[in-house]
Curated annotation (Swiss-Prot):
Residues 32-116 form the Inhibitor I9 domain. Expressed in roots, stems, flowers and young leaves. Barely detectable in matures leaves. It comes from the Eukaryota. Residues 1-27 form the signal peptide. It is found in: Secreted. Residues 468-499 are annotated as: Disordered. It comes from Glycine max (Soybean). GO terms for cellular component: extracellular region. InterPro entries: PA_domain, Peptidase_S8/S53_dom, Peptidase_S8/S53_dom_sf, Peptidase_S8_Ser-AS, Peptidase_S8_subtilisin-rel, Peptidases_S8_3, S8pro/Inhibitor_I9, S8pro/Inhibitor_I9_sf. The lineage of its organism: Eukaryota, Viridiplantae, Streptophyta, Embryophyta, Tracheophyta. This is Subtilisin-like protease Glyma18g48580.
């Protein structure tokens, strides 16, 4: 395998610096998506149906161009299976003309999405309870199909071994395997575990120029897609570790699931870009292939407008997925801790935040005989040898700014000052900060202390740096009089300064850390700016220092100049990593309850989540060590062993979502287009607050009481549930009736929740409470989030 990787690296390395052989040649033309709702040809289209749909797209665009042939040349994707629309290279004026067509729901630019980049399953409790565990009850996700839309897959990873697997489930309608074999390999790239792999790059090439044909493959050259897919559905692999830490058995949440890879994210430099037209094509194909769960570990890096729920590719794709009984799970984003930054917020998307687990990759720093614990994957220095510390700002080149040197940006450090020392740099990125180490190494440093900024809080990341590095919590800068050179940073009583002596211990793995989970400071936060009545994120899952399978082609650090290749596993962080944890859990529930809807699976995971850590105290926020709230973790931290048998669920149908869109003020013609072009009449009696969501959010309360309705479906044995509430500060909550009795599975009961703000409630400030139904065995919890106008 090693020689094959080396050969592949030699073959492709020249292209990695000169990949885009042809520039984009379309002048002012850009890639637009023309969205037209759903097809009327039904869930199992024939080849004639597909041809007819594509012809209708040619006809529509041809009416604008005055030429059907020109329309064929302009269209790069015809979404002809389940999503109705096409992607085409258009002038702005042409896009505006198409938008006037009454059959068109929306026309929008194909957006650039960014990636939201072992022990975790033990931390989630899957190993503890034998026959009562979610793994046992969910048969390890057996024959559930998880589709991953990402950077592709490294098929040779043992995480995708099909040893012991039977025939591929008959529900699978895919089978295409667009992965080139490694040089000299006779092994099939897809098998009974990895049952399909496709790639989509037309929109990427439209924006950036054509890729070399050697790169036209679903093979993962980045590592992100392999990591996320193995986290969701990877097989058991003993002896998984990276840089001699984290030794254990790697596995996914649904280790016996079948998996499929859809490559839409492309990059020769980190991070990869995923263009919306490619994403939509992949989702349309995944629906048609017959997946049960779709994992999407990326999103836009900005908040779209309130009108944009149907100008966002992931939102559109997820809507069509749920209409075919497929759950789409997406990452919340890495733009925290700023409020209102959460991505992927449509109510039909399952949105996942990131938090820590109880394992650390740790290294001790001894600074002037004071011990400081930090995070590290790799320290290759003699543990008893002391090195001199230099602050990066004291080693800056004359032409470098103070800020650039503080962040150890490229070309800022003076080699004559840094050589042979430990350099202290300030961490710039919220997720990945490997470039700082490259600058320090280039300048001759022996190691680096990477000090968090306040925005990073106390989320410590063990990253695959290019040399010995330890990440430490933020240390306040010591003020200096004007004109005095800054030579120290740190706590006022004990600042670090140039000339201090430093020792670094070897990196080691520590288990049973407390408290855990803690909300990652980078995890994007609510409130939901697009649909304020829907709490987002939905839940949190492990997303810090996650060890999983990796592309053996990619460098450990993802830096092109990093020649360390051949890693079977790597440690990454981000909501990209927490997202597939939820997808893996969803796979278990789908195997256990194959008839459940996506909303029921989502409800089960949400209503059984916890807001307590492993010390039985409220979950903290790593940003400032205060208590986290529902805008950080949604309903709480996932608990798969409880989600597998939740007692009650809040179910939703396509009609419920259409009524929600009616109440949200969307055009009735648009709603009919989403309803497979069948007329849908908005009754006018629905409120956005009445969507049967497992959480309750009321963002515009006055002093007058507000009544909302919820319906629960019994999925457990006959029992009587009683309600309890924890009212938000300044508000009262009443539930009618206070008890619900169920005599059979599938029985539905409706209750009302009356919420009233008092004059003591603070205006324009969110407060938090919850509602719980319990029968003595199950606890079905819904967070309540309220704000007085």
């Amino acid at each position: 395998m090693g020689s094959s990787i080396f050969c592949l690296h030699l073959i492709l390395s020249s292209f990695f610096l000169f990949t885009f052989l042809l520039a984009a040649v379309n002048g002012s033309k850009k890639c637009y998506i023309v969205y037209m709702g759903a097809h009327s040809h039904g869930p199992s289209p024939t080849s004639a149906d597909l041809e007819l749909a594509t012809d209708s797209h040619y006809d529509l665009l041809g009416s604008i161009f005055g030429s059907r042939e020109k329309a064929k040349e302009a269209i790069i994707y015809s979404y002809n299976r389940h999503i109705n629309g096409f992607a085409a290279l258009l002038e702005e004026e042409e896009a505006a003309d198409i938008a006037k067509n009454p059959n068109v729901v929306s026309v929008f630019l194909s957006k650039e999405h960014k990636l939201h980049t072992t022990r975790s399953w033990e931390f989630l409790g899957l190993h503890r309870r034998g026959q009562n565990s979610a793994w046992q009850k969910g048969r390890f996700g057996e024959n559930t199909i998880i589709g991953n839309i990402d950077t592709g897959v490294w098929p040779e990873s043992q995480s995708f071994s099909d040893k012991g697997y039977g025939t591929v489930p008959s529900k699978w309608r895919g089978g295409l395997c667009q992965i080139n074999k490694l040089p000299g390999s006779m092994k099939n790239t897809c098998n009974r575990k990895l049952i399909g792999a496709r790639y989509y790059n037309k929109a990427f090439e439209a924006h950036n120029g054509q890729l070399d044909p050697l790169l036209h493959t679903a093979r993962d050259f980045v590592g992100h897609g392999t990591h996320t897919l193995s986290t969701a559905g990877g097989n058991f692999v003993p002896g998984a570790r990276v840089f001699a830490v984290g030794n254990g058995t790697a596995k996914g949440g649904s280790p016996r699931a079948r998996v499929a890879a859809y490559k839409v994210c492309w990059s020769l430099t980190d991070p990869a870009s995923c263009y919306g037209a490619d994403v939509l094509a992949a989702i349309d194909q995944a629906i048609d292939d017959g997946v049960d769960v779709i994992n999407v570990s990326f999103g836009v890096s900005y908040v779209v407008t309130a009108e944009g729920i149907f100008t966002d590719e992931i939102s559109i794709g997820a809507f069509h997925a749920i209409s075919k009984n497929i759950l789409l799970v997406a990452s919340a984003g890495n733009d925290g801790p700023t409020p209102g930054t959460v991505a992927n917020v449509a109510p039909w998307v399952f949105t996942i935040a990131a938090s820590t687990l109880d394992r650390d990759f740790s290294s001790n720093l001894t600074i002037n005989n004071q011990l400081i614990e930090g995070a590290s994957l790799f320290v290759n220095l003699p543990p008893n040898q002391a090195f001199s510390l230099i602050l990066s700002t004291d080693a800056k080149l004359a032409n470098a700014t103070f800020r650039d040197a503080q962040l150890c940006r490229r070309g800022t450090l003076d080699r004559t000052k840094v050589n042979g020392k430990i350099v202290l740099c300030t961490r710039e990125g919220k997720i990945k900060s490997v470039a700082e180490g490259l600058e320090a190494l280039t300048a001759g440093a022996r190691g680096m202390i990477l000090n968090n900024q306040m925005q990073n809080g106390k989320t410590l990341s063990a990253e695959p740096h290019v040399f010995s590095t330890v990440n430490t919590p933020p240390r306040r800068a010591k003020s200096r009089p004007h004109g005095v050179k800054t030579t120290a940073i740190g706590d006022e009583d004990d600042p670090l300064k140039t000339g201090d002596t430093i020792k670094m211990s070897r990196a080691r793995t520590l288990f049973g850390r407390k408290p855990a989970p803690v909300m990652a400071s980078f995890s994007s936060r609510g409130p939901n700016k697009i649909q304020p009545s829907i709490l987002k994120p939905d839940v949190t899952a492990p997303g810090v220092n996650i060890l999983a399978a990796y592309s053996e082609f990619a460098s450990a650090s993802s830096l092109l100049v990093d020649n360390r290749r051949g890693f079977k596993f790597n440690v990454l962080q981000g909501t990209s990593m927490s997202c597939p944890h939820a997808s893996g859990i969803a796979g278990l529930l789908k195997t256990r309850h194959p008839s459940w809807s996506p909303a029921a699976i989502k409800s089960a995971i949400m209503t059984t989540a916890t807001t307590l850590d492993n010390t039985n105290r409220p979950i903290q926020d790593a940003f400032d060590k205060t208590l986290a709230d529902a805008f950080a973790y949604g309903s709480g931290h996932v608990r798969p062993d409880l989600a597998i048998e939740p007692g009650l669920v809040y179910d939703l149908s396509l009609t419920d979502y259409l009524n929600f869109l009616c109440a949200s003020g969307y055009d009735q013609q648009l709603i009919s287009a989403l309803n497979f072009n069948r007329t849908f009449i908005c009754s006018g009696s629905h409120s956005v607050n009445d969507l049967n969501y497992p959480s309750i959010t009321l963002p515009n309360l006055r002093l007058k009481p507000v009544t909302i309705a919820r319906t629960v479906t019994n999925v457990g044995p006959p029992s009587t549930y009683t309600v309890s509430t924890r009212s938000p500060n300044g508000y009262s909550i009443a539930v009618v009736p206070p008890s619900l009795t169920f005599t059979k599975i599938g029985e539905r009961k409706t209750f009302k929740v009356i919420v009233q703000a008092s004059s003591a409630a603070t205006r324009r400030k969110y407060e938090f409470g919850d509602l719980r139904w319990t029968d003595g065995k199950h606890i079905v919890r819904s967070p309540i989030t309220v704000k007085r106008r």
